[in-house]
Structures are given as structure tokens and as C-alpha cells.
Regions:
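N-terminal glycine-rich phosphate-binding loop for ADP-containing cofactors
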Residues: 2-36, 58, 66, 70, ...
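STAS-typified acidic loop motif
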Residues: 34-61, 88
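Short, glycine-/small-residue-enriched flexible loop/hinge segments at domain edges that mediate gating
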Residues: 44, 78-89, 101
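Amphipathic alpha-helical interaction surfaces in cytosolic regulatory modules
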Residues: 88-102, 129
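Short, active-site-adjacent cap segments at secondary-structure transitions
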Residues: 89-93, 148-149, 478-479
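Gly/Ser-rich catalytic serine loop of serine hydrolases
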Residues: 141-151
Length: 718
């Protein structure tokens, strides 16, 4: 097949000097009498699973060459089918985006040429992948491992698909990064499984902490036609393919496959498509408030897919992908993605891993909601005994009961087996006596946020644990060093600050107090890795990173309300950023009393940069937990509390003031050595506060907009 003429447009191998080429390696498999020979293409870049297969230009051309040979052999009657699978544990992780971005916008490339190059990459992907569905023989995708973006699109172009039940990740993460599924995904997936299910993968999951599916969930959605266990996945997939080829196994497809009208061949009715698209548009608006173009472009592609021909759908994807490959959104997204992937592997300031102590039993002081969430995470991830304590048996029973109930939920949803549920329940126990911590290796407190209370807790725990037990605090703002006053071994106390909800947010701030030794920090980091959390080491300064930055941001906005800015103006001033929630929804999540406590702590430490809002105090003292009623209408009693003032600001003035406050505070934090570098601030805000990927990190955003230079006289990255 002749691929599009992209000579002179498509970046050459010289433009992709770092491309790790994914080769298409072909071998024949005899499927037996009546089925014939299947030409099995294995995608393999020559590395193990820690370096996934990706598609750059040379990788695409390697697959194209394999398909040239397969097409010729099929025409000659030598093969009855073509199969595609990947190296162990990996099908493919999509396009080589770093290489593509560098090649498209490299030195000396003018804007017109850059777009032509981007269009060339988009067109090449379509031209190669679509051949899998246009061969003279059926094609089979055997999804043996991770399939992300272009990796999933390879499978969608095939006639049939099998999937391993052990696949850990299958997804379209493009909108998370600032792109669209541009090699067939936005057209093919909704036509296969219906618009509502497709939009969950294409838009909802990427904008929800980049959620991934596992193999069974993908099979349930209809992405694959059959599912097999990983131990004999390829053998069973080949056996199934032989049954399909001989007619012993039939696979139904949605719509009327032979109809001339594209709409008649697609899954779902016109009404179902309209409803799904409308719901997705509302969802996007609530998530990004118009600030990120990629999800809107993806939605437009899906909306058009029902009636568009394949050529029309793919051409629209080419156009969208070319535009977005050149966007600031993608560059920001790639910065954030690289930061999360690379900097979390070895946190700045991390001591030698060999200093970490083994953890075979965990203690949790407290049995409230936060403590119970922490205990549940330890049970699930560490699979070691966890004991909770509290002041009375009723509280202990409630905490243990919460853990049991959450395990039962996992069991009812089929996510764990009955045996696993029983094992996990057996690991969690409770006691009113701290003697239960005597043989614990790691004890974390999650009690009331008051220094005297936490000091008392640590004094009681230290009296019963062994000398090597690490004592951790989940404090969100208090001094770790101050908590160690009077302890015999302050060197083993470390901050271990989770974010709420514990199971969802991936960040843990590991706080080094003035006496904390390397063994305690190394153990905390090792535990964080076992919990599948990303750790950042921070200095023992009030509120650490995320809460300090958020409190300054929220404080600047609430101060404008004190001055007379109407609630609606202040609440929506930051909408252009596309933050995960508005300021007063954030206040609701944190709780006015906790927000007031953190603000007072920071005011005591840093003065009027963190002025305590009289209206925040009034809200906290009123007992109201939110500005909003349960139906999300505004509570008129709260609005009355927030009224007054004579110097209102506009939305743009509120946003400018809040961002300038952030620029000032982050510069001060870096000067204080709260973290090692601006990248650590960025990482904390992305992982702990949901700072949007489409903005990149917070410090490059403040540089890009000129706010950092305006406020501080210098950019964060000179």
C-alpha cells in the first residue's frame, strides 16, 4: 500500500535522534486444519517492560513494511490471517510524544512547516494503522499488556481483539496531556462500544486523575471480543482465532455492518449519541471551564463519528492532532508528565535506600475517617498487620468497621476475591491501649490537629515501641520538630502527610524535622513506594508545600470578598485556569474550621501575607460547613455572612491578585529551602492539589505568563 506522500514533511530519522524504534517482528503460526497460517506481528523495541513500546516515524514504517509483506502473502493465499501482539507485558504505550514535539518545533522550523510536519505524523499513523482493518484477510489484536493511546488504536483497527485479564492499564490518556486520540480512536471506539462508554475512556477518565482500566473492565465495555488468563494468553488467543477462522466461533458487531450509511453501522441510536455528547460537554465544562482545548476537540470528533465516513473521521482526527501537537497545552502537559514520571523515581534529597528499615507491622493512632482511610491503605498495599487505637472502644470499633466495610465494597464489585477480603480483614485490629504498638515498626498518628495533643501521643507511643520503630505524623501544617520536644529519640520522627481522599491523591509530603535521621526518611520513602504513592521531601516549615500554596491562593481570594467583591465574582475568578474546583468548593472540601486553623498557623508564622479573613472566621464559627446547600444552590445565610465591604474587584483583578500572591509565596518558599527546586513545587501541586496538566507546572505557568518576573523581578527559570 502506498502511504501518503510525506517526504519533506515527515521529520526524518535525523530529527528523531532519540527514537527507540519499535520493530514489527513477524513469525508464522499454523492454526491447524481449516484455519490456515496466521502471520503474527510482535511489537518489540528491544528493551524490557520498563521501557514500553512507542511509535515514532521509524517504528510506524517498520509496521508498515510488515503489513506490506502480509498483504502480498494474503493475496497469494499463503496466510489466512494477521495477528498483532506486543513484547511481554506491553502492547504499546502510544506515540513517541517527546520526540514528536521536538521534531515538529525544532530549531529552524517555521510555523507553517511545523504544522505540515505535525500533519505528516498524524497522517502516517492513520495510513499505517488502518491497513490492519483493510487487509484481504482478518486481523487479530492480542492485547497482552499495557495498551495506551496509539497502542489501543492499533487494536481497534483490527477485525477482532482478545485481551489478557492481567492487563494493568488500558486507556486513552491523550486529553490528560493536551491531545486527542488521533490515530483512529476518536472515530472507531464510539462506533464499536457506543458513545457513552467511549466518552468515558476518551474524556471522563483522562480528566479524572487520568484513570486507567484493567483488562476485565475493558472487556466488559466491549473493547475486546474474548478474554483469557495471562498464563496461557497467547496460546488461548491463537486457539480462539482458529475457531473464528473456521466459523466455529462467531462475533457479533453493533449496528448493521453491511449498511451503506455510516450511521447504520455504528453502535447506538441518534438519541443516545446526542445524550452522551451533551453529558460529556457538561462534564468537560465542570472540569476545565473552557481552559483546555483538547477535550472539546475530542468531543467534537466523537460527535461527528456517528455519521462520518472512515475517511472523513480520520481526516478530522489528522487536523485536530496537527493543531494540538503545536499547542502550548501539549508542551505544558509533556512537562508535567515527564516530571511525574521521572522526578518521583528518586526524590530530591533522598538518602540511601539501604537505610530503610523493614516494616512488618503498622500502628495507626486515631480511628476517625482520615485514620481509617490510612489504615485501609496500609492493609491493602503492605499486606501486614495494622492496629488502630483511639480513646474508647466505640471509636476503635467504628474505625475498624469502616475498613471492613470498604473491603466488602471491593468484594461486592468483584475487585478482590473472597479469600483476599478475608485476609485483609484479618490484618486490621483495634485497641484502646497503645501497648498494641509494642512490636510495630511504623506508627503514624492521625489525631486532632493540635500540637499538645500530638506531643502527648508521641510520648505515649515512644514508651511502648522499640528503639528502631519510626514514628510518623500526618500533620498538615504543624511543626514536626516541635512535636518531638521531650522525646528520647526525636531522630525517628518524620512527617508523612497524606492528602484527602487518601486512596485517590497520589502525593505524600515526607517532612524532615531538625532531628530526623536518614533512616527515618529512607523508611518513610520506602513505605510510600509500597503504598504506590509519590513522595516529595520537604523541610519542616509551616503547612509544608501544598497547604501553604493553597492557603495563600485562597487567602488572596477571600480577602477580596472581605473588601467587598461579590461571592459569585470571587468564586469564578479562577475559572480560566481550569482548576479541579472553585475556591469555595475547595473550602468546603477542607472544611472552614480546618482552613481557619491553617490560616491562623500561617499568620502566626509569616504575618500579614496570610491575613486571617474575618469572614472565614465568621463562617467557621457559624458551624456552616459550606457556602453551598446539598443541592449546590448558594446558602443565603452564608452569603449574608460574606457580605459587606466597599472596594469590590473584578474577576480579572481577583485572579491577577491570587496569581501574584502565588508567585511571591513560591519564591519565598524556594529561598527558605522548603524544597530543593521549583520542580518539586510543581510536582506537589500537580499530585496533591490537582494543578492541571494542561497548564504544566505552576512555576513554568507563572514564568510563561510573566507574573513571576513582574512580582519577583526574575523568572523561576532564568
Amino acid at each position: 500500500m502506498n502511504i501518503p506522500n510525506v517526504s519533506g514533511i515527515l521529520p526524518s530519522a535525523d530529527d528523531f535522534p532519540g527514537e527507540v524504534v519499535t520493530r514489527a517482528i513477524v513469525r508464522d503460526v499454523d492454526l491447524g486444519p481449516g484455519a490456515g497460517v496466521l502471520a503474527l506481528i510482535t511489537l518489540d523495541n528491544g528493551h524490557d517492560h520498563t521501557k514500553p513500546n512507542t511509535f515514532g516515524p521509524q517504528g510506524l514504517l517498520s509496521l508498515n513494511a510488515a503489513l506490506d509483506a502480509a498483504e502480498a502473502r494474503a493475496a497469494a493465499g499463503e496466510i489466512a490471517a494477521v495477528g498483532v501482539t506486543g513484547k511481554p507485558f506491553i502492547l504499546a504505550a502510544g506515540a513517541d510524544l517527546d520526540g514528536a514535539a521536538a521534531a515538529i518545533t525544532g530549531a529552524g522550523v517555521d510555523p507553517e512547516e511545523a504544522r505540515e510536519r505535525a500533519l505528516g505524523i498524524a497522517s502516517l499513523g492513520h495510513a499505517v494503522f488502518r491497513r490492519l482493518g483493510e487487509l484481504p484477510v482478518p486481523s487479530f489484536a492480542f492485547i497482552n499488556g499495557v495498551a495506551l493511546g496509539g497502542g489501543l488504536e492499533v487494536a481497534l483497527h483490527c477485525t477482532y481483539r482478545t485481551i489478557s485479564s492481567g492487563v494493568p492499564m488500558i486507556a486513552f490518556p491523550e486529553c490528560f496531556l493536551g491531545l486527542v486520540p488521533g490515530w483512529g480512536g476518536a472515530y472507531l471506539l464510539p462506533r464499536l462500544i457506543g458513545p457513552a462508554r467511549a466518552l468515558k475512556l476518551i474524556i471522563e477518565n483522562p480528566l479524572s486523575q487520568n484513570k486507567m482500566l484493567r483488562g476485565p473492565a475493558a472487556f466488559e465495555l466491549g473493547i475486546a471480543d474474548a478474554m483469557f488468563e495471562p498464563a496461557d494468553f497467547l496460546e488461548e488467543s491463537l486457539r480462539w482465532a482458529s475457531l473464528v477462522l473456521t466459523g466455529a466461533e462467531t462475533v457479533s458487531r453493533p449496528g448493521r455492518p453491511d449498511a451503506a450509511d455510516p450511521a447504520a453501522r455504528a453502535a447506538g441510536t441518534e438519541e443516545e449519541w446526542a445524550q452522551a455528547v451533551a453529558a460529556a460537554r457538561l462534564f468537560i465544562g465542570g472540569k476545565v471551564h473552557g481552559a483546555a482545548p483538547a477535550p472539546y476537540r475530542a468531543l467534537d470528533l466523537v460527535a461527528a463519528a456517528r455519521t462520518a465516513s472512515r475517511d472523513e473521521g480520520f481526516a478530522a482526527e489528522d487536523d485536530a492532532l496537527a493543531d494540538l501537537l503545536l499547542s502550548e497545552e501539549l508542551r505544558a502537559g509533556l512537562y508535567a508528565f515527564d516530571l511525574v514520571q521521572k522526578r518521583t523515581r528518586r526524590p530530591a534529597g533522598a538518602p540511601d535506600k539501604s537505610l530503610a528499615r523493614p516494616v512488618t507491622k503498622v500502628g495507626v493512632v486515631g480511628a476517625g475517617l482520615m485514620a481509617a482511610q490510612i489504615a485501609l491503605l496500609f492493609v491493602r498495599r503492605l499486606q501486614v498487620p495494622v492496629v488502630m487505637t483511639d480513646l474508647d472502644q466505640a471509636r476503635v470499633d467504628a474505625g475498624v468497621g469502616y475498613v471492613h466495610a470498604e473491603i466488602d465494597k471491593q468484594l461486592s464489585r468483584g475487585r478482590i476475591s473472597p479469600d483476599a477480603a478475608n485476609r485483609q480483614k484479618a490484618l486490621i485490629t483495634g485497641s484502646v491501649a497503645k501497648d498494641a504498638f509494642a512490636d510495630a515498626d511504623f506508627v503514624i498518628e492521625a489525631v486532632f490537629e493540635e500540637l499538645a495533643v500530638k506531643r502527648q501521643v508521641f510520648a505515649e507511643v515512644e514508651a511502648v515501641v522499640n528503639e528502631t520503630c519510626v514514628l510518623a505524623t500526618n500533620t498538615s501544617s504543624l511543626s514536626v520538630t516541635a512535636m518531638t520536644s521531650g522525646l528520647a529519640h526525636p531522630e525517628r520522627v518524620v512527617g508523612f502527610h497524606f492528602f484527602n481522599p487518601v486512596a485517590v491523591l497520589p502525593l505524600v509530603e515526607v517532612v524532615r524535622g531538625s532531628s530526623t535521621d536518614d533512616a527515618a526518611v529512607a523508611t518513610a520513602l520506602a513505605v510510600g513506594r509500597q503504598l504506590k504513592k509519590n513522595c516529595v521531601i520537604v523541610a519542616d516549615r509551616p503547612a509544608f508545600v501544598v497547604n501553604r500554596v493553597l492557603t495563600r491562593f485562597l487567602g488572596e481570594i477571600t480577602r477580596t470578598v472581605d473588601e467587598g467583591t461579590p461571592f459569585e465574582v470571587a468564586e469564578h475568578a479562577a475559572d480560566p485556569l481550569g482548576l479541579p474546583m472553585t475556591p469555595f468548593l475547595l473550602l468546603q472540601l477542607v472544611g472552614p474550621r480546618i482552613a481557619l486553623h491553617v490560616a491562623e498557623t500561617l499568620h502566626d508564622a509569616f504575618g500579614d501575607r496570610f491575613a486571617v479573613s474575618p469572614k472565614l472566621r465568621a463562617l467557621a464559627e457559624s458551624g456552616k460547613s459550606s457556602v453551598y446547600l446539598p443541592d449546590f444552590s448558594v446558602d443565603p445565610e452564608v452569603i449574608e455572612l460574606l457580605g459587606g465591604g466597599s472596594a469590590p474587584s473584578t474577576e480579572s483583578e481577583v485572579l491577577e491578585r491570587a496569581l501574584e500572591g502565588l508567585a511571591q509565596e513560591i519564591k519565598i518558599m524556594l529561598d527558605e529551602g522548603v524544597v530543593a527546586a521549583p520542580e518539586d513545587i510543581d510536582l506537589c501541586m500537580i499530585l496533591g492539589a490537582g494543578w492541571p496538566f494542561h497548564l504544566g507546572g505552576i512555576t513554568p505557568y507563572l514564568d510563561r505568563t510573566g507574573i513571576a518576573a513582574k512580582v519577583n523581578g526574575v523568572a523561576f527559570r532564568g
